[in-house]
Amino acid sequence: MTLEEFSAGEQKTERMDKVGDALEEVLSKALSQRTITVGVYEAAKLLNVDPDNVVLCLLAADEDDDRDVALQIHFTLIQAFCCENDIDILRVSNPGRLAELLLLETDAGPAASEGAEQPPDLHCVLVTNPHSSQWKDPALSQLICFCRESRYMDQWVPVINLPER
């Protein structure tokens, strides 16, 4: 490995960490503003009704989910719809960390008191924008720029690994 390759790898890792941190910040804000939709079915309903307000689509799957043919078909359809409607897409490679981020806020809410039901479907998460203020949010702007740069490099659905805390 040459010095240039080592330096480029380090920069890429640092950049991915920054993008992961920005994603955490966007999710935290979306939870507090209630501008988040969780679940494949719920996401499909929202995309059908109001695609113009969706600013980010997250698809989360681990290695076990990669063998789920039905889920992969859903992902393909959602990706196609998002590309057609200029919605940025990110693939999250560690859905466990995504669950931690999304369920920390909801544990104290009514969902936790319903008893031991099935865990929520976190395979698809949509972030909507209630106002035209998306460009004022630096974390969301960073994610949008990252998605745009990835598309320029023919990586239409970039994979993000959320940093463990």
From Swiss-Prot:
One GO term describing the cellular component: nucleus
Q: Which domain of life is it from?
A: Eukaryota
Q: Name one Pfam family in it.
A: Ribosomal_L7Ae
Q: Does the keyword DNA damage apply?
A: yes
Keywords of the record, alphabetical order, are:
Cell cycle, DNA damage, Growth arrest, Nucleus, Phosphoprotein
Say what the protein does: Might affect PCNA interaction with some CDK (cell division protein kinase) complexes; stimulates DNA excision repair in vitro and inhibits entry of cells into S phase. In T-cells, functions as a regulator of p38 MAPKs by inhibiting p88 phosphorylation and activity.
Q: How does it assemble?
A: Interacts with AURKA, PCNA, GADD45GIP1 and MAPK14.
Question: What is the name of the protein in this document?
Answer: Growth arrest and DNA damage-inducible protein GADD45 alpha
What lineage does UniProt assign to this protein's organism?
Eukaryota, Metazoa, Chordata, Craniata, Vertebrata
